[in-house]
Amino acid sequence: IIGRSDLTKSQYLYIDVFIRNIEEKGFNVLPVFTSQKPGHHEEQVIERFFISCDSLPRVSALLNLGCWYNTRPEERVVLEKLGVPVINGIILSTNQKDWEKSLVGIDIYNRSNLVAIPELAGYIEPSVAVVFDDFDHNIRIKNMIGYQMETLLGRIKNIHNLQTKPNREKKVALIYYSYPPGKENIGASYLNVLPQSILSILQRMRQEGYDTGGQPIDRAAIFNRVMDYGRNIGSWAPAEVDKLVRKGDPVLVPMEVYKEWYDKLSLKIRTEMENKWGKPEESELMVWKDSSGKSYFVIPVVKYGNIILTPQPPRGWEDNAKSLYHDPLVPPPHQYLAYYLFLKYGFHADALVHIGTHGTHEWLPGKEAGLGPDDYPEALIMDVPNIYPYIVDNVGEGLQAKRRGQAVIIDHMTPPFDKASLNPELRDLKSGISKYYDQKSKSPISSMAQFRDLVLRIKTLGLDKDLKLDTITDQNLEDIDDYLKEIEENKTPFGLHTFGVSPDEAYTKATTEAIVSMQKDLMGKDLELFREQVQKNIAKSGKEELDAFIRALNGK
Protein backbone atom coordinates (compact mmCIF):
# COMPACT_ATOMS: atom_id res chain seq x y z
CA ILE A 1 0.00 0.00 0.00
CA ILE A 2 1.50 3.31 -1.11
CA GLY A 3 0.34 6.89 -0.76
CA ARG A 4 -1.23 8.26 -3.94
CA SER A 5 0.66 11.52 -3.52
CA ASP A 6 3.91 9.71 -4.37
CA LEU A 7 2.47 8.89 -7.77
CA THR A 8 1.11 12.36 -8.45
CA LYS A 9 4.37 13.99 -7.34
CA SER A 10 6.53 11.59 -9.39
CA GLN A 11 8.07 10.14 -6.21
CA TYR A 12 7.91 6.59 -7.53
CA LEU A 13 11.58 5.72 -8.17
CA TYR A 14 11.84 3.87 -4.85
CA ILE A 15 8.65 1.97 -5.69
CA ASP A 16 10.06 0.75 -9.00
CA VAL A 17 13.27 -0.37 -7.29
CA PHE A 18 11.39 -2.26 -4.61
CA ILE A 19 9.02 -3.97 -7.06
CA ARG A 20 11.89 -5.11 -9.29
CA ASN A 21 13.81 -6.54 -6.36
CA ILE A 22 10.92 -8.44 -4.85
CA GLU A 23 9.93 -9.85 -8.25
CA GLU A 24 13.50 -11.09 -8.68
CA LYS A 25 12.94 -13.16 -5.53
CA GLY A 26 10.00 -14.91 -7.16
CA PHE A 27 7.10 -12.93 -5.70
CA ASN A 28 4.18 -11.30 -7.43
CA VAL A 29 3.58 -7.71 -6.39
CA LEU A 30 0.26 -5.89 -6.27
CA PRO A 31 1.03 -2.19 -5.70
CA VAL A 32 -2.02 -0.20 -4.68
CA PHE A 33 -2.08 3.58 -4.31
CA THR A 34 -4.53 5.15 -1.92
CA SER A 35 -5.28 8.52 -0.42
CA GLN A 36 -3.48 9.41 2.79
CA LYS A 37 -6.26 11.72 3.93
CA PRO A 38 -8.66 10.67 6.68
CA GLY A 39 -12.18 9.68 5.73
CA HIS A 40 -11.30 7.99 2.44
CA HIS A 41 -12.43 4.54 3.61
CA GLU A 42 -9.21 2.62 3.19
CA GLU A 43 -11.00 -0.54 4.30
CA GLN A 44 -12.72 -0.51 0.88
CA VAL A 45 -9.31 -0.51 -0.78
CA ILE A 46 -8.37 -3.68 1.13
CA GLU A 47 -11.67 -5.34 0.25
CA ARG A 48 -11.40 -4.47 -3.44
CA PHE A 49 -7.79 -5.32 -4.17
CA PHE A 50 -6.59 -7.81 -1.55
CA ILE A 51 -9.61 -10.02 -0.80
CA SER A 52 -11.11 -12.25 -3.47
CA CYS A 53 -14.80 -12.74 -4.18
CA ASP A 54 -14.77 -15.93 -2.09
CA SER A 55 -13.27 -13.99 0.85
CA LEU A 56 -9.74 -15.39 0.52
CA PRO A 57 -6.61 -13.23 0.69
CA ARG A 58 -4.90 -12.52 -2.62
CA VAL A 59 -1.61 -11.72 -0.86
CA SER A 60 0.70 -13.45 1.61
CA ALA A 61 1.59 -10.21 3.36
CA LEU A 62 0.73 -6.55 3.20
CA LEU A 63 3.47 -3.92 3.26
CA ASN A 64 2.40 -0.46 4.28
CA LEU A 65 4.87 2.13 3.01
CA GLY A 66 4.05 5.16 5.12
CA CYS A 67 0.41 5.35 4.18
CA TRP A 68 -2.60 4.87 6.47
CA TYR A 69 -2.89 3.11 9.78
CA ASN A 70 -6.26 1.31 10.03
CA THR A 71 -7.11 2.22 13.60
CA ARG A 72 -10.83 2.76 12.97
CA PRO A 73 -12.98 -0.25 13.98
CA GLU A 74 -14.26 -0.89 10.44
CA GLU A 75 -10.70 -0.88 9.09
CA ARG A 76 -9.46 -3.31 11.73
CA VAL A 77 -12.33 -5.68 11.00
CA VAL A 78 -11.27 -5.81 7.34
CA LEU A 79 -7.65 -6.46 8.32
CA GLU A 80 -8.82 -9.37 10.48
CA LYS A 81 -10.81 -10.68 7.53
CA LEU A 82 -7.74 -10.40 5.30
CA GLY A 83 -5.83 -12.48 7.84
CA VAL A 84 -2.24 -11.81 6.74
CA PRO A 85 0.54 -9.90 8.52
CA VAL A 86 0.87 -6.19 7.84
CA ILE A 87 4.47 -4.99 7.91
CA ASN A 88 5.25 -1.41 8.81
CA GLY A 89 7.60 -0.04 6.13
CA ILE A 90 8.81 3.28 7.53
CA ILE A 91 9.49 6.34 5.37
CA LEU A 92 11.71 8.85 7.19
CA SER A 93 11.74 12.57 6.47
CA THR A 94 15.50 12.68 6.99
CA ASN A 95 18.37 11.54 4.75
CA GLN A 96 20.23 8.26 5.03
CA LYS A 97 23.43 9.62 6.62
CA ASP A 98 21.57 11.48 9.35
CA TRP A 99 19.55 8.38 10.18
CA GLU A 100 22.63 6.16 10.26
CA LYS A 101 24.46 8.53 12.62
CA SER A 102 21.48 9.09 14.90
CA LEU A 103 21.60 7.58 18.38
CA VAL A 104 17.80 7.84 18.63
CA GLY A 105 16.77 6.62 15.17
CA ILE A 106 13.23 7.99 15.09
CA ASP A 107 12.70 10.98 17.36
CA ILE A 108 9.84 11.16 19.86
CA TYR A 109 7.83 13.58 17.70
CA ASN A 110 7.78 11.27 14.67
CA ARG A 111 7.68 8.03 16.65
CA SER A 112 3.99 8.38 17.40
CA ASN A 113 3.01 8.54 13.71
CA LEU A 114 5.62 6.18 12.31
CA VAL A 115 5.62 3.51 15.02
CA ALA A 116 3.01 3.89 17.78
CA ILE A 117 -0.14 4.40 15.70
CA PRO A 118 0.71 1.52 13.32
CA GLU A 119 1.14 -0.67 16.43
CA LEU A 120 -2.43 0.13 17.45
CA ALA A 121 -3.56 -1.20 14.07
CA GLY A 122 -1.58 -4.41 14.60
CA TYR A 123 1.30 -3.73 12.21
CA ILE A 124 4.49 -5.69 12.92
CA GLU A 125 8.24 -5.59 12.24
CA PRO A 126 8.75 -1.80 11.95
CA SER A 127 11.44 -1.49 9.28
CA VAL A 128 13.08 1.72 8.11
CA ALA A 129 12.91 1.45 4.33
CA VAL A 130 12.84 4.85 2.62
CA VAL A 131 14.60 8.18 3.20
CA PHE A 132 14.73 11.55 1.47
CA ASP A 133 17.93 12.27 -0.43
CA ASP A 134 18.78 15.84 -1.40
CA PHE A 135 19.16 16.37 -5.14
CA ASP A 136 20.64 19.69 -6.26
CA HIS A 137 19.40 22.38 -3.88
CA ASN A 138 15.64 22.43 -3.77
CA ILE A 139 14.66 18.91 -4.79
CA ARG A 140 14.28 15.99 -2.41
CA ILE A 141 13.77 12.46 -3.73
CA LYS A 142 12.53 9.40 -1.85
CA ASN A 143 15.03 6.55 -2.09
CA MET A 144 14.94 2.99 -0.84
CA ILE A 145 17.92 2.15 1.42
CA GLY A 146 19.52 -0.81 -0.34
CA TYR A 147 20.55 -2.92 2.65
CA GLN A 148 17.31 -2.13 4.49
CA MET A 149 15.35 -3.24 1.44
CA GLU A 150 17.15 -6.60 1.51
CA THR A 151 16.25 -7.09 5.17
CA LEU A 152 12.64 -6.10 4.50
CA LEU A 153 12.40 -8.48 1.56
CA GLY A 154 13.88 -11.21 3.74
CA ARG A 155 11.18 -10.63 6.33
CA ILE A 156 8.45 -10.89 3.71
CA LYS A 157 10.03 -14.04 2.30
CA ASN A 158 10.28 -15.68 5.73
CA ILE A 159 6.66 -14.88 6.56
CA HIS A 160 5.66 -16.53 3.28
CA ASN A 161 7.90 -19.45 4.20
CA LEU A 162 6.00 -19.97 7.46
CA GLN A 163 2.73 -19.95 5.51
CA THR A 164 3.81 -22.54 2.95
CA LYS A 165 6.42 -24.81 4.53
CA PRO A 166 5.05 -28.05 6.04
CA ASN A 167 5.14 -27.97 9.83
CA ARG A 168 7.18 -31.17 10.00
CA GLU A 169 9.99 -29.39 8.14
CA LYS A 170 10.02 -26.15 10.14
CA LYS A 171 12.90 -25.53 12.49
CA VAL A 172 12.03 -23.55 15.61
CA ALA A 173 14.21 -22.40 18.50
CA LEU A 174 12.45 -22.06 21.87
CA ILE A 175 14.60 -19.59 23.81
CA TYR A 176 14.25 -19.19 27.57
CA TYR A 177 15.81 -16.88 30.15
CA SER A 178 18.67 -18.38 32.22
CA TYR A 179 20.31 -15.91 34.60
CA PRO A 180 22.73 -15.94 36.31
CA PRO A 181 24.79 -18.54 34.41
CA GLY A 182 25.56 -21.67 36.37
CA LYS A 183 22.47 -21.35 38.57
CA GLU A 184 19.14 -23.15 38.41
CA ASN A 185 17.20 -19.98 37.62
CA ILE A 186 15.15 -20.59 34.50
CA GLY A 187 12.00 -18.60 34.13
CA ALA A 188 10.29 -15.33 33.27
CA SER A 189 8.10 -12.72 34.88
CA TYR A 190 5.14 -14.56 36.45
CA LEU A 191 5.45 -17.42 33.92
CA ASN A 192 6.10 -21.05 34.78
CA VAL A 193 8.56 -21.63 31.95
CA LEU A 194 10.16 -24.88 33.13
CA PRO A 195 8.67 -27.34 32.74
CA GLN A 196 5.00 -26.40 32.42
CA SER A 197 4.96 -23.75 29.65
CA ILE A 198 7.55 -25.57 27.55
CA LEU A 199 5.54 -28.77 28.01
CA SER A 200 2.35 -27.03 26.89
CA ILE A 201 4.06 -25.57 23.81
CA LEU A 202 5.77 -28.82 22.77
CA GLN A 203 2.58 -30.85 23.17
CA ARG A 204 0.64 -28.44 20.95
CA MET A 205 3.44 -28.35 18.37
CA ARG A 206 3.44 -32.15 18.21
CA GLN A 207 -0.34 -32.08 17.67
CA GLU A 208 0.17 -29.59 14.82
CA GLY A 209 2.56 -31.95 13.04
CA TYR A 210 5.93 -30.50 14.03
CA ASP A 211 8.84 -32.92 14.18
CA THR A 212 9.49 -33.12 17.93
CA GLY A 213 11.59 -36.28 17.75
CA GLY A 214 10.87 -39.60 19.38
CA GLN A 215 11.54 -38.52 22.96
CA PRO A 216 8.71 -38.52 25.49
CA ILE A 217 7.23 -35.08 26.11
CA ASP A 218 6.48 -35.01 29.82
CA ARG A 219 7.27 -32.77 32.78
CA ALA A 220 10.03 -34.89 34.29
CA ALA A 221 11.87 -35.50 31.01
CA ILE A 222 11.81 -31.84 30.00
CA PHE A 223 12.89 -30.64 33.43
CA ASN A 224 15.75 -33.10 33.78
CA ARG A 225 17.10 -32.60 30.27
CA VAL A 226 17.04 -28.81 30.53
CA MET A 227 18.61 -28.77 33.99
CA ASP A 228 21.32 -31.20 32.91
CA TYR A 229 22.15 -29.87 29.46
CA GLY A 230 20.20 -26.67 28.79
CA ARG A 231 21.77 -24.13 31.17
CA ASN A 232 24.38 -21.43 30.73
CA ILE A 233 27.72 -21.90 32.47
CA GLY A 234 29.85 -19.10 33.90
CA SER A 235 33.39 -18.38 32.76
CA TRP A 236 34.66 -19.46 36.20
CA ALA A 237 33.64 -23.10 35.62
CA PRO A 238 35.52 -24.43 32.56
CA ALA A 239 35.24 -27.97 33.95
CA GLU A 240 31.45 -27.69 33.72
CA VAL A 241 31.73 -26.62 30.08
CA ASP A 242 33.90 -29.67 29.40
CA LYS A 243 31.35 -31.88 31.17
CA LEU A 244 28.52 -30.41 29.08
CA VAL A 245 30.42 -31.07 25.85
CA ARG A 246 31.24 -34.67 26.76
CA LYS A 247 27.93 -35.75 28.32
CA GLY A 248 25.38 -33.48 26.72
CA ASP A 249 24.74 -32.76 23.09
CA PRO A 250 25.49 -29.04 22.70
CA VAL A 251 26.12 -27.18 19.48
CA LEU A 252 29.82 -26.55 18.91
CA VAL A 253 30.52 -23.58 16.66
CA PRO A 254 34.13 -23.70 15.40
CA MET A 255 35.92 -20.41 15.88
CA GLU A 256 36.68 -20.10 12.18
CA VAL A 257 32.99 -20.59 11.33
CA TYR A 258 32.02 -17.92 13.83
CA LYS A 259 34.53 -15.55 12.24
CA GLU A 260 32.88 -16.07 8.84
CA TRP A 261 29.51 -15.14 10.32
CA TYR A 262 31.03 -12.36 12.41
CA ASP A 263 32.51 -10.75 9.29
CA LYS A 264 28.97 -10.31 7.94
CA LEU A 265 28.31 -7.78 10.73
CA SER A 266 28.96 -4.08 10.27
CA LEU A 267 32.40 -2.59 10.81
CA LYS A 268 31.00 -0.46 13.63
CA ILE A 269 29.79 -3.49 15.57
CA ARG A 270 33.03 -5.42 15.01
CA THR A 271 35.09 -2.45 16.17
CA GLU A 272 33.01 -2.04 19.33
CA MET A 273 33.16 -5.75 20.05
CA GLU A 274 36.93 -5.93 19.81
CA ASN A 275 37.43 -2.74 21.83
CA LYS A 276 35.40 -4.27 24.67
CA TRP A 277 35.93 -8.02 24.42
CA GLY A 278 38.97 -8.46 22.19
CA LYS A 279 39.15 -10.57 19.06
CA PRO A 280 36.94 -13.66 18.81
CA GLU A 281 39.81 -16.06 19.52
CA GLU A 282 40.47 -14.26 22.83
CA SER A 283 37.04 -15.20 24.17
CA GLU A 284 36.72 -17.35 27.29
CA LEU A 285 32.98 -17.35 28.00
CA MET A 286 31.39 -20.67 26.90
CA VAL A 287 34.49 -21.64 24.92
CA TRP A 288 35.79 -25.22 24.74
CA LYS A 289 38.99 -26.58 23.19
CA ASP A 290 39.44 -30.08 21.87
CA SER A 291 42.58 -32.19 22.27
CA SER A 292 44.21 -30.48 19.30
CA GLY A 293 43.61 -27.01 20.78
CA LYS A 294 40.86 -26.08 18.34
CA SER A 295 38.38 -23.61 19.89
CA TYR A 296 34.60 -23.79 19.78
CA PHE A 297 31.79 -21.68 21.14
CA VAL A 298 29.47 -23.91 23.14
CA ILE A 299 25.72 -23.40 22.77
CA PRO A 300 23.59 -25.47 25.16
CA VAL A 301 20.60 -27.04 23.45
CA VAL A 302 18.05 -29.72 24.21
CA LYS A 303 16.83 -31.26 20.98
CA TYR A 304 13.30 -32.40 20.22
CA GLY A 305 13.50 -33.23 16.54
CA ASN A 306 13.44 -29.96 14.60
CA ILE A 307 12.71 -28.03 17.80
CA ILE A 308 15.52 -26.94 20.09
CA LEU A 309 15.22 -25.67 23.65
CA THR A 310 18.06 -23.29 24.38
CA PRO A 311 18.92 -20.65 27.01
CA GLN A 312 19.48 -17.08 25.94
CA PRO A 313 23.23 -16.53 26.36
CA PRO A 314 24.78 -14.51 29.19
CA ARG A 315 24.85 -10.77 28.63
CA GLY A 316 28.35 -10.37 30.10
CA TRP A 317 30.80 -11.48 32.76
CA GLU A 318 29.15 -12.64 35.98
CA ASP A 319 31.00 -10.22 38.26
CA ASN A 320 29.21 -7.28 36.67
CA ALA A 321 26.32 -9.02 34.94
CA LYS A 322 23.66 -7.12 36.88
CA SER A 323 24.94 -3.81 35.57
CA LEU A 324 25.21 -5.15 32.04
CA TYR A 325 21.70 -6.52 31.56
CA HIS A 326 20.18 -3.13 30.83
CA ASP A 327 23.35 -1.24 29.96
CA PRO A 328 22.65 0.80 26.81
CA LEU A 329 26.28 0.97 25.71
CA VAL A 330 28.20 -2.22 26.55
CA PRO A 331 28.08 -4.74 23.68
CA PRO A 332 27.33 -8.39 24.41
CA PRO A 333 30.25 -10.87 24.44
CA HIS A 334 31.24 -12.92 21.40
CA GLN A 335 29.37 -16.02 22.55
CA TYR A 336 26.14 -13.98 22.56
CA LEU A 337 26.73 -13.05 18.92
CA ALA A 338 27.74 -16.62 18.06
CA TYR A 339 24.44 -17.83 19.52
CA TYR A 340 22.16 -15.67 17.34
CA LEU A 341 24.35 -16.04 14.27
CA PHE A 342 24.18 -19.82 14.69
CA LEU A 343 20.38 -19.73 14.87
CA LYS A 344 20.33 -17.87 11.54
CA TYR A 345 23.21 -19.42 9.59
CA GLY A 346 23.81 -22.75 11.34
CA PHE A 347 20.45 -23.99 12.57
CA HIS A 348 18.56 -22.16 9.78
CA ALA A 349 15.67 -21.34 12.11
CA ASP A 350 12.33 -20.68 10.48
CA ALA A 351 11.29 -18.84 13.64
CA LEU A 352 12.64 -17.89 17.04
CA VAL A 353 10.42 -18.00 20.12
CA HIS A 354 11.53 -15.98 23.14
CA ILE A 355 9.50 -17.44 25.99
CA GLY A 356 8.33 -14.97 28.60
CA THR A 357 8.97 -11.50 29.94
CA HIS A 358 11.72 -10.59 29.37
CA GLY A 359 15.08 -11.41 27.82
CA THR A 360 18.07 -9.26 26.93
CA HIS A 361 18.07 -9.13 23.13
CA GLU A 362 15.73 -6.14 22.84
CA TRP A 363 17.81 -4.20 25.40
CA LEU A 364 21.11 -4.42 23.53
CA PRO A 365 22.90 -1.21 22.43
CA GLY A 366 21.56 0.72 19.48
CA LYS A 367 18.94 3.22 18.40
CA GLU A 368 15.75 3.59 20.41
CA ALA A 369 13.49 2.98 17.40
CA GLY A 370 14.01 2.60 13.67
CA LEU A 371 17.06 0.37 14.02
CA GLY A 372 19.61 -0.56 11.37
CA PRO A 373 22.54 -2.98 10.91
CA ASP A 374 24.80 -0.98 13.27
CA ASP A 375 22.36 -1.68 16.11
CA TYR A 376 22.82 -4.97 17.95
CA PRO A 377 19.17 -6.09 18.23
CA GLU A 378 18.64 -5.60 14.49
CA ALA A 379 22.01 -7.07 13.54
CA LEU A 380 21.29 -10.27 15.47
CA ILE A 381 17.60 -10.85 14.71
CA MET A 382 18.07 -9.95 11.01
CA ASP A 383 15.06 -11.22 9.05
CA VAL A 384 14.13 -14.23 11.21
CA PRO A 385 10.55 -14.12 12.57
CA ASN A 386 10.61 -13.49 16.31
CA ILE A 387 7.59 -14.75 18.26
CA TYR A 388 7.40 -13.58 21.85
CA PRO A 389 4.88 -14.82 24.45
CA TYR A 390 4.69 -11.84 26.82
CA ILE A 391 2.71 -11.02 29.95
CA VAL A 392 -0.30 -8.89 29.03
CA ASP A 393 0.11 -6.21 31.70
CA ASN A 394 3.69 -5.21 30.87
CA VAL A 395 2.92 -2.93 27.95
CA GLY A 396 6.00 -0.70 28.18
CA GLU A 397 8.61 -3.42 27.96
CA GLY A 398 6.52 -5.26 25.39
CA LEU A 399 6.79 -2.19 23.16
CA GLN A 400 10.57 -2.40 23.54
CA ALA A 401 10.47 -5.96 22.24
CA LYS A 402 8.29 -4.91 19.29
CA ARG A 403 10.26 -1.85 18.29
CA ARG A 404 13.81 -3.01 18.95
CA GLY A 405 13.51 -6.80 18.75
CA GLN A 406 11.07 -7.10 15.81
CA ALA A 407 8.89 -9.22 18.10
CA VAL A 408 5.39 -10.42 17.33
CA ILE A 409 3.88 -10.33 20.81
CA ILE A 410 1.60 -13.17 21.94
CA ASP A 411 -0.06 -11.85 25.09
CA HIS A 412 -0.49 -14.31 27.93
CA MET A 413 -2.50 -14.03 31.13
CA THR A 414 -1.15 -12.86 34.44
CA PRO A 415 -1.25 -15.38 37.29
CA PRO A 416 -4.69 -15.69 38.87
CA PHE A 417 -5.64 -13.06 41.44
CA ASP A 418 -7.37 -13.41 44.78
CA LYS A 419 -7.74 -11.52 48.02
CA ALA A 420 -4.39 -11.29 49.76
CA SER A 421 -5.80 -12.16 53.24
CA LEU A 422 -3.60 -11.69 56.31
CA ASN A 423 -0.64 -13.64 57.60
CA PRO A 424 -1.10 -15.29 61.04
CA GLU A 425 0.48 -12.41 63.01
CA LEU A 426 -1.70 -9.77 61.34
CA ARG A 427 -4.77 -11.98 61.62
CA ASP A 428 -4.18 -12.39 65.37
CA LEU A 429 -3.65 -8.63 65.73
CA LYS A 430 -6.91 -7.89 63.93
CA SER A 431 -8.71 -10.32 66.19
CA GLY A 432 -7.03 -8.73 69.22
CA ILE A 433 -8.24 -5.26 68.21
CA SER A 434 -11.82 -6.55 67.94
CA LYS A 435 -11.55 -8.20 71.36
CA TYR A 436 -10.11 -4.99 72.82
CA TYR A 437 -13.07 -2.90 71.65
CA ASP A 438 -15.46 -5.53 72.98
CA GLN A 439 -13.71 -5.60 76.37
CA LYS A 440 -13.47 -1.80 76.49
CA SER A 441 -17.25 -1.51 76.18
CA LYS A 442 -17.61 -3.81 79.18
CA SER A 443 -14.69 -2.74 81.39
CA PRO A 444 -12.50 0.20 80.30
CA ILE A 445 -10.02 -0.37 83.14
CA SER A 446 -9.42 -4.08 82.47
CA SER A 447 -8.95 -3.36 78.75
CA MET A 448 -5.85 -1.20 79.40
CA ALA A 449 -3.61 -4.28 79.61
CA GLN A 450 -4.96 -5.45 76.27
CA PHE A 451 -4.21 -2.03 74.76
CA ARG A 452 -0.57 -2.12 75.96
CA ASP A 453 -0.18 -5.58 74.45
CA LEU A 454 -1.63 -4.36 71.15
CA VAL A 455 0.78 -1.40 71.06
CA LEU A 456 3.73 -3.74 71.57
CA ARG A 457 2.57 -6.07 68.79
CA ILE A 458 1.89 -3.17 66.40
CA LYS A 459 5.41 -1.81 66.89
CA THR A 460 6.95 -5.25 66.54
CA LEU A 461 5.18 -5.69 63.20
CA GLY A 462 6.17 -2.17 62.08
CA LEU A 463 2.64 -1.03 61.34
CA ASP A 464 3.25 2.27 63.11
CA LYS A 465 6.00 2.97 60.56
CA ASP A 466 3.73 1.96 57.67
CA LEU A 467 1.18 4.55 58.80
CA LYS A 468 3.81 7.05 60.00
CA LEU A 469 2.42 7.18 63.54
CA ASP A 470 4.52 8.86 66.21
CA THR A 471 2.37 7.42 68.99
CA ILE A 472 -0.38 4.84 69.13
CA THR A 473 -3.60 6.03 70.70
CA ASP A 474 -7.03 4.59 71.12
CA GLN A 475 -8.18 6.75 68.21
CA ASN A 476 -5.54 5.76 65.67
CA LEU A 477 -6.00 2.14 66.67
CA GLU A 478 -9.07 2.40 64.45
CA ASP A 479 -6.79 3.55 61.60
CA ILE A 480 -4.67 0.46 62.12
CA ASP A 481 -7.78 -1.72 62.05
CA ASP A 482 -8.84 -0.07 58.76
CA TYR A 483 -5.33 -0.62 57.39
CA LEU A 484 -5.54 -4.33 58.20
CA LYS A 485 -8.91 -4.54 56.44
CA GLU A 486 -7.38 -2.83 53.39
CA ILE A 487 -4.51 -5.34 53.32
CA GLU A 488 -7.00 -8.18 53.67
CA GLU A 489 -9.01 -6.96 50.68
CA ASN A 490 -6.02 -6.31 48.43
CA LYS A 491 -5.74 -8.44 45.31
CA THR A 492 -2.50 -10.33 44.82
CA PRO A 493 -1.22 -12.79 42.20
CA PHE A 494 -1.08 -16.42 43.23
CA GLY A 495 1.62 -18.64 41.79
CA LEU A 496 2.78 -18.54 38.17
CA HIS A 497 0.90 -18.66 34.90
CA THR A 498 1.42 -21.59 32.54
CA PHE A 499 1.33 -20.56 28.88
CA GLY A 500 -1.60 -22.21 27.15
CA VAL A 501 -3.38 -23.26 30.35
CA SER A 502 -6.38 -21.43 31.84
CA PRO A 503 -6.72 -21.10 35.63
CA ASP A 504 -8.84 -23.73 37.36
CA GLU A 505 -12.47 -22.98 38.18
CA ALA A 506 -11.79 -21.56 41.64
CA TYR A 507 -9.03 -19.24 40.49
CA THR A 508 -11.06 -18.23 37.44
CA LYS A 509 -13.88 -17.08 39.71
CA ALA A 510 -11.47 -15.34 42.10
CA THR A 511 -9.72 -13.51 39.26
CA THR A 512 -13.07 -12.53 37.78
CA GLU A 513 -14.14 -11.00 41.08
CA ALA A 514 -10.81 -9.18 41.37
CA ILE A 515 -11.38 -7.60 37.95
CA VAL A 516 -15.05 -6.85 38.59
CA SER A 517 -14.22 -5.16 41.90
CA MET A 518 -12.29 -2.49 40.00
CA GLN A 519 -15.24 -1.71 37.73
CA LYS A 520 -16.94 1.25 39.42
CA ASP A 521 -19.16 2.56 36.63
CA LEU A 522 -21.38 -0.51 36.07
CA MET A 523 -24.36 -1.65 38.11
CA GLY A 524 -27.14 -4.23 38.05
CA LYS A 525 -27.53 -6.23 34.85
CA ASP A 526 -24.64 -4.43 33.16
CA LEU A 527 -22.31 -5.49 35.95
CA GLU A 528 -23.52 -9.08 35.78
CA LEU A 529 -23.03 -9.19 32.00
CA PHE A 530 -19.53 -7.81 32.47
CA ARG A 531 -18.80 -10.47 35.12
CA GLU A 532 -20.02 -13.27 32.83
CA GLN A 533 -17.92 -12.02 29.90
CA VAL A 534 -14.77 -11.69 32.01
CA GLN A 535 -15.20 -15.19 33.38
CA LYS A 536 -15.71 -16.64 29.89
CA ASN A 537 -12.63 -14.81 28.58
CA ILE A 538 -10.44 -16.11 31.41
CA ALA A 539 -11.74 -19.66 30.99
CA LYS A 540 -10.85 -19.74 27.28
CA SER A 541 -7.58 -17.76 27.58
CA GLY A 542 -5.28 -20.79 27.68
CA LYS A 543 -6.50 -22.25 24.40
CA GLU A 544 -6.44 -18.81 22.77
CA GLU A 545 -2.80 -18.30 23.80
CA LEU A 546 -1.75 -21.50 22.07
CA ASP A 547 -4.00 -20.80 19.07
CA ALA A 548 -2.35 -17.38 18.63
CA PHE A 549 1.08 -18.95 19.01
CA ILE A 550 0.35 -21.48 16.27
CA ARG A 551 -1.07 -18.77 13.99
CA ALA A 552 2.18 -16.86 14.38
CA LEU A 553 4.17 -19.98 13.47
CA ASN A 554 1.90 -20.28 10.42
CA GLY A 555 2.83 -16.75 9.33
CA LYS A 556 -0.64 -15.41 10.10
Whereabouts are the PLM-identified features?
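Ligand/cofactor-recognition surfaces for anionic moieties
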Residues: I1-K556
